[in-house]
């Protein structure tokens, strides 16, 4: 299958300064993308797709936008949904054309919306599940989520302060028929279930097993361990026989032979994911998140608990987007080889470095099926 005859539509965002520019490009054969016909949002804006529509969740400005594709452009549908100031909406999970859930990290609530009409239909207060509620912390910081068998699984960061979580992994289970919480489950082997925003998990494999990655406080705290946890199909508790950390693995071909957490990742099937590892050996002192090329692409096998470095150079934390498009993984990077999209055919193990140059730093990308 050629790159041009199957993969017709990509929606992506690039960042320039404090803005994110969202636009479409035709396929993986375009040589260059431009911000000329882009929609402009605040920098931390996240892309979601459902039913042929594109949703832009503008986190810092607390707004949700809905678009359709028409003649190669993004045309807004319905009115912009304005959420409370400081709500920091970071994730959107679709149950149906009539129901979706927004994780409001800043509020400690889930908003229930109708994604067709773009109207709020309800909310779920999560304050009673906050670890620090006795001392006045009523926000468990809901992050990424997934629906399996009528249950919404929501990762809770359980922060003491920003990026400083209580130890342990916490996930809240909610009945999607009644929107009532069922229970909160926890596991002390790893910390901080999901990374606030969408980073490729939780995900469900072909067996129906649910995997969730705990980011461990982004490597800042020695007592906050990272790693994958699993909730098997038919179960609603963590599988005590499964835990897969990557920070304990000695990895050849990287400085210091160690990575301390996984950032964004994409599941492609058969237990395989592709994602970015943060490599402390490439972090300057003090850290420079804009320029340090500490994010390195890896293949991850959650079944066999192995990792393999890919043949791409490192990129920065603000330029590590990715998506699956057919048999290709598309990586948006600002590496030493240039800024843009790099391709990897995971079925044939073939690399195409800097296939598409971008105007701006790649931030998020989605493939429109």
Model feature map: region roles:
Residues 2-7:
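Short, small-residue-biased leader/transition segments that mark boundaries at the very start
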Residues 15-18, 61-63, 106-109, 159-163, ...:
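Short glycine/acidic-enriched loop and turn motifs that connect beta-strands
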Residues 19-112:
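Post-signal peptide N-terminal segment of secreted/secretory-pathway proteins
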Residues 31-40, 75-83, 120-134, 181-189, ...:
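Beta-propeller fold detector
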Residues 39-51, 84-93, 135-144, 192-201, ...:
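Repeated scaffold domains used in trafficking and secretory/extracellular systems
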Residues 112-115, 166-179, 224-236, 290-303, ...:
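Beta-propeller blade signature
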Residues 154-168, 212-227, 274-292:
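Short, conserved, GDST-rich strand-edge loop motifs in beta-rich repeat architectures
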Residues 258-333:
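Loop/turn-rich, solvent-exposed surfaces of beta-rich toroidal or solenoidal domains
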């Amino acid at each position: 299958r050629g790159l041009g005859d199957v993969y017709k539509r990509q929606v992506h965002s690039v960042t320039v300064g404090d803005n994110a520019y969202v636009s479409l490009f035709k396929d993986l054969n375009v040589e260059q993308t431009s911000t000329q016909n882009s929609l402009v949002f605040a920098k931390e804006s996240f892309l979601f797709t459902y039913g042929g529509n594109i949703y832009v969740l503008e986190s810092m400005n607390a707004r949700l936008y809905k678009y359709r594709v028409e003649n190669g452009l993004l045309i807004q549908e319905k009115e912009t949904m304005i959420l409370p100031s400081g709500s920091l909406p970071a994730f959107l999970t679709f149950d149906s054309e009539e129901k979706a859930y927004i994780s409001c990290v800043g509020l400690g609530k889930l908003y229930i919306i109708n994604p067709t009409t773009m109207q709020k239909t309800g909310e779920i207060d999560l304050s009673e599940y906050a670890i620090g509620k006795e001392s006045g912390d009523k926000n468990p910081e809901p992050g990424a989520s997934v629906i399996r068998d009528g249950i919404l699984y929501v990762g809770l960061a359980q922060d003491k302060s920003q990026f400083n979580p209580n130890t342990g992994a916490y996930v809240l289970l909610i009945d999607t028929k009644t929107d009532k919480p069922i229970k909160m489950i926890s596991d002390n082997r790893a910390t901080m279930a999901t990374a606030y925003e969408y980073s490729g998990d939780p995900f469900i494999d072909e067996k129906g097993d649910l995997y969730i990655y705990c980011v461990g406080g982004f490597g800042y705290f020695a007592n906050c361990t990272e790693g994958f946890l699993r909730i098997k199909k038919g179960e609603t508790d963590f599988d005590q026989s499964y835990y897969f950390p990557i920070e304990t693995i000695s990895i050849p071909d990287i400085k210091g032979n160690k990575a301390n957490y996984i950032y964004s990742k994409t599941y492609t099937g058969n237990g395989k994911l592709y994602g970015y590892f943060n490599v402390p050996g490439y972090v300057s002192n003090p850290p420079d998140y804009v320029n340090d090329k500490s994010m390195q692409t890896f293949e991850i096998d959650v079944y066999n608990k192995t990792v393999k470095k890919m043949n791409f150079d490192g990129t920065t934390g603000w330029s590590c987007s990715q998506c699956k498009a057919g048999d290709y993984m598309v990586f948006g990077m600002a590496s030493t080889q240039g800024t843009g999209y790099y391709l990897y055919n995971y079925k044939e193990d073939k690399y195409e470095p800097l296939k598409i140059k971008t105007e701006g730093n790649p931030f998020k990308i989605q493939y429109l099926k």
